[in-house]
Amino acid sequence: MPLEVVVELQIRAISCPGVFLPDKEVVYLGVYLLNQYLETDCFPSVFPIVIQQSMRFEKVFEEAMDPGAVAELLESFLTRFELVQLVSPAWEELAYYEKNTRDFLFPEPKLTSSHLGMQREVLMKTAIWFPGIAPKLEFSTRTAILECVFPCKNRFLWEERCKLQQSFSKLNGPANNRKKKPKEKNSDQLSKGTPFWGPSPQRLHLHRPTQRNPGKSFRFLGERKPPFVVRHVDSGNPFGENNLEHHSQKSRRKPKFINFDLAKKRAFSLDSLEANIKVVREPDERIVLRSQSPPPLNSGHFRKPLLNHQGDVDFHPETTVTTSQLSSPPSPLDHSLLQERFQPCSASMWQKIQERACSLLTPNRAHPKEDSISETNSIHERPSYLLRKHLLREHRYF
């Protein structure tokens, strides 16, 4: 903090015995101390001149941090006393006294002075034309070095700085406490909540996809429904090969979630996944009537569906059964059973089913024409015991 020097000067009198001034004009005493100049009142030019006045001088040292530094700085300041007479047309200096401020305020101790600073006397230097001996100045000083809260010159700036520092400390204090509290709360919540995240499959099912891809969370919720509960027929792809291939690609993209959702999908569906696949692969009436005279079978066409579903583990048993059954000749009972099954359905009913299937299966990729023909031939040549086995289950879907 800056230090301030306060000096109280008490001037008693100026004595010069046996001296008479030639001019009768009034005189006064001027004091220059700590870069400040003060004057006493005017008195008659007759010695002794009794003044009996007090003066106060103040000076702030902003760079000083201790009284020793202040004492060193006081050596560079000058203290001067002037005895002036107001002679016309101007003023005239009769005598003067000057010294550095440190020696003036803190003089060396002497044997004659019993009370330092209380009663002091100094001899002034006279001018050339002054008649008589040098006048003597009687005074007393009292000096104090204080800690200054704000500089006198920059008082308002110093007050603004103090206000800003106080407001800044008030703002930073609660902010630090607020920042620390959420961290502690989060650590407590993590320590308490971590044991419950692991064993719960519903939380894992709901929260893990939203963390990886939160924008597509609605798609994940839509996958709860069984994919093959209702039979959908597409004119371009009647046997659902596109659905199976799309399902296999989706299982490759999300291998972590398909194993977890498989049990839930089986619980929602009426039949097992194998039965649903068989239901989807059942032929359409138009295909059966169109393929009364099937073309010669080609073994190259039947290997393509097997290669398409080779990456999906769940469909390996079904594909092996279909390829083994393709070698058996078509049974005449298939045509009769299919005709009996599809006779009750009207043309309008089939048209609605086809429109609904087309609207649902539009984003799927269309298969080549050869694959669809090969699939129709494979379904046409399927043995009859598969249809008899799932006949009762198929009626409930319509």
UniProtKB/Swiss-Prot annotation:
Chain positions covered by the region annotation Disordered: 170-215
Keyword rRNA processing assigned = no
Q: Would you kindly state one Gene Ontology biological process term found in this protein's UniProt entry?
A: spermatogenesis
InterPro entries named among the record's database cross-references: SPATA6_fam, SPATA6_N
Q: What GO cellular component is one of the record's annotations?
A: sperm head-tail coupling apparatus
Phosphoserine-modified residues are where? S269, S272
Q: Which UniProt keywords apply?
A: Phosphoprotein
Q: Which domain of life is it from?
A: Eukaryota
Q: Which GO terms describe its molecular function?
A: myosin light chain binding
Pfam families, from UniProt?
Answer: SPATA6
Q: What is this protein called?
A: Spermatogenesis associated 6-like protein
Q: Which organism is it from?
A: Rattus norvegicus
